[in-house]
């Protein structure tokens, strides 16, 4: 029985955790998904964005029927005090698109799910509008899937970009399945040497964040394995 399901966006975010897990591939709605399994935990990398996360969460629930689903991955800081590598487990998740929110049983602060990679200017607005400390793209969608299927829900995120970090729009580097187009990104940045310092910083931040995230996930898995309590979605408020 798989007790814990984890939905991440990209494998590079969780590679240190799943490098020695067994792998199972399934075709779901015309897409090949890879599920990483170990003991009573299953993890899937569904892709970037809300739609990719929703499909991945629904697939995990349909195939494995875990009792709790976690949204895990990278997040941007909305507060200057949050630094790269800090793990964030919010008490509330807000969907910036429709204003709906889910209150969790465990955690601290607010995470807002936004429709794109937020620029420094957008981060400032999100902080004011939602009183959030961090921003991601997938957690609200995973929470909605968990709620619809009666599964518990939790969030483990790590700061990968700080409050003042900004980069040209990343939308062009994400395909319709939520996969990051690495070659296109490499060509884009190779032809723009003024971006190289930011690219180097982004790579360092991502590596540091991935290690911290996987550390946090290991602790979460151990805690759940030792407990009979399952995090659940609390009151879900819709506008």
Indicate where each model-derived feature is located.
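Assembly/interface hotspot detector across virion components, adhesins/toxins, and nucleic-acid enzymes
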Residues: 21-27
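Glycine-rich phosphate- or other oxyanion-binding loops that anchor nucleotides, phosphorylated ligands
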Residues: 3, 27-239
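Short, conserved "active-site rim" segments that organize catalytic pockets and cofactor/ligand binding
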Residues: 2-21, 41, 87
